[in-house]
Amino acid sequence: MSILLLGKDGQVGWQLQRSLAPHGEVIACGRSECDLTDLDRLRSLVRQLKPAVIVNASAYTAVDRAESEPELAMRINGEAPGVLAEEVARLGALLIHYSTDYVYDGCKTEPYLESDPTNPQSVYGRTKLAGEDAIRASGAKSVIFRTSWVFGARGGNFVKTILRLAREKEALNVVTDQIGSPTSAAMIAISSSSYTNEPP
């Protein structure tokens, strides 16, 4: 079985290369091999490779910068997943996609459920929700993971930053108005790879 992995160089993508390998031939692409802003090239790549599974770990993740680059964020987070989903539906394949807790408004005091209403408050959140909506509208077989506070051995993340600051400073000043669920990139990758055995 062939598995197309997009976003191979990120925290989750790096782990996915390892967890997906036992499940088939992994064709791993980074930004240089697959630019998600070029939707025609993206479509051509999928048509050429005809994978049984596409794992989209690629995204525009600069939450604050998305406010000044809304078109670019929408292209990568909203439109590219839609193109992938259309091609997956055409192939009868499976799409595994990663979204975010930013699709919610952050007002709830308990953990969010998948069934809770979405209400993104940022450009980033709106673009990620647009990607989810495009996937669902395509009718493609898909799994969407809403992740938050991802950490891993590779790349920068909140956990690494706090550990570094704890070594460097006597006292830390950290915001107290944010709630999240730190999620291991390795756990995300292992959970994702299990879907290649039994598609939904």
Regions found by a protein language model. Give the residues of each.
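SDR active-site strand-loop-helix element
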Residues: 6, 29, 54-58, 95-100, ...
